[in-house]
Regions:
Chain A
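Canonical P-loop GTPase G-domain recognition
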Residues: 186, 192-249
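Alpha-helical scaffold elements adjacent to nucleotide-binding pockets in ATP/GTP-utilizing enzyme cores
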Residues: 91, 128, 153, 157, ...
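Nucleotide-state-sensitive switch-loop elements of NTP-binding domains
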Residues: 3-47, 55, 64-150, 157-164, ...
Length: 316, 316
């Protein structure tokens, strides 16, 4: 075990931050360290916290961390939300709440959006989760904003997803729920002291009852919270625990771990295979002809891709 | 030229809708038709309209269509936004405004979110744009929500991106601009009759002046609009025209077309190569051993992927 990997296994947060930065930059040295850490991963309970901007995810997260710490659990946070407190975009109150946690050795918070590059977020996020997992954090929360490809990919890689919404968000944001509805294991109606909170709960319940899917055994709870003063946070943590227990008892906890590793592996194969295929092509006249025909629209991209892939052979 | 492709080239909207549905379902028949259409693409001016939910993109879009039609341009719309009017999540006023357009032969609007599947949106979106391009629409607008991998990929594939924001959106949404700032060619401050509009314009101008990038020749304009009654829409369409002219004069219009085709081709190669690699592996004992070691964490996903990719050979 090399020095950096050892430090990270011992919980050294500076070493972990250095490694995550290497991984963000796709540095081979980072991958080498992550390989050494890998056998020590697979123990964390991984949560997703998602919802549109402005619903109070950051404030809720600050209180969630407090409650997890009360229960003697170490908490890691990977914030994929560009508006998360770490990146400086949040309200002063959240920054103060978070500062309390940053002085706690049992809490480690990393934002994946500070470097300004948005591409490849889901890959780097998964790598950061592996690092925090190896460090021994019991609970890892991935905070994402909105709904899109990133969120769906992140949801596929966590054990439990909580979707946060608000009363009175207006038609446009209500419509987003159609996408978020599919990925939620737990639903949170925040700012539940505002008018219309019970209406949102009723609407969600109705939509959830109509939701079709193979996983009919788990009935997603809808938790009302007032994040600003911590109301409902204990109930929310209880709901996370209940879902974890459900996953363990049904064997789905291990299934999701296996599926996550397999998908990550498959994604790596895709990227490495593409690099290998394209790296060796530039000097070949046949490839240059193909690209010329593509650019001049003499050949369509599907036919061009089929031509190239036809020449690929794979043995193991 | 087969029947379906011919109908689409003649502008038949029902045939186009059928084809886009086939492409959403990844049906080989859809790809065959798209191949036939491909030589007829590459003529449209492709715009991206993006911003957080609630900023009034749909209302703005309805007025934009009217103004483009005034200028005798045929307009296609691909709405990647789940809250777009087509999917039924929008305000009644927008639906009425859109209905007027749906009865106009020179307008074609497709939503990519009605089917409820969120994965692979950016690929299907590009395919839908190709279909509309082949149909002869002069302007194609891609409407997306929020900021994420999808938006960045969409921004990479359009000629001109307009980013819409609002006065007084609060800290959290302001922070999102950091991501949106990078991809905007034109910025729109909608609801500019609300207090604080000039402050947002000033902030944006300041942030844009600090924006670093190779493309220093184009100074992104900031347009104030009141979408609900169409104020500023003429100026916005003028800004789109000015950016188009800038792209054409500097050769960037063709460059972006070429880059878009190349990236689409590269993406297809990645997907087809992965399918080819994995399709033939399941029966191989060596592969099954590799997966067993992966699942039991005896081998890490990087090493497993390297092992597999090592055996790939590519000739053309």
């Amino acid at each position: 075990m090399k020095g950096e990997a050892k430090k990270i296994l011992q919980g050294n947060q500076l070493a972990a931050a250095r490694l995550i930065r290497l991984l963000e930059d796709a540095e081979p040295k980072g991958i080498q360290i992550l390989k050494a850490l890998y056998p020590h991963t697979g123990n964390a309970f991984i949560l997703g916290l998602t919802g549109p901007p402005g619903v109070g995810k950051s404030t809720l997260l600050a209180h969630l961390i407090t409650e997890f710490r009360q229960r003697d659990l170490k908490v890691g946070v990977v914030a994929v939300d560009p508006s998360s407190p770490i990146s400086g975009g949040a309200l002063l109150g959240d920054r103060l709440r978070m500062r309390k946690h940053t002085e706690d050795e049992g809490v480690f918070i990393r934002s994946m959006a500070t470097r300004g590059h948005l591409g490849g977020l889901s890959k780097t996020t998964k790598e950061a989760v592996l690092v925090l997992d190896a460090m021994g954090y019991d609970v890892i929360v991935i905070e994402t904003v909105g709904v899109g490809q990133d969120e769906v990919e992140v949801a596929e890689s966590v054990h439990t997803t909580a979707v946060v919404s608000l009363p009175g968000m207006g038609d446009e944001i209500q419509a987003m729920k159609a996408g978020l509805l599919e990925i939620g294991d737990i639903f949170v109606v925040n700012k539940a002291d505002k008018p219309g909170a019970d209406d949102v709960v009723d609407q969600l319940r109705l939509m959830l009852d109509m939701r079709t899917g193979s996983d009919n055994e788990w009935k997603p709870p809808i938790i009302k919270t007032v994040a600003i003063d911590g109301q409902g946070v204990i109930e929310l943590v209880d709901a996370f625990s209940a879902h974890r227990q459900y996953l363990v008892e049904t064997g789905k906890f291990d299934e999701r771990n296996v599926e996550r590793e397999y998908q990550f592996f498959r994604r790596l194969v895709m990227e490495m295979a593409a690099d290998k295929i394209f790296d060796n092509l530039d000097d070949l006249p046949a490839y240059n002809d193909l690209i010329t025909n593509l650019i001049t629209r003499k050949v369509d991209p599907y036919t061009a891709a089929e031509t190239l892939v036809k020449g690929i052979q794979c043995k193991i």
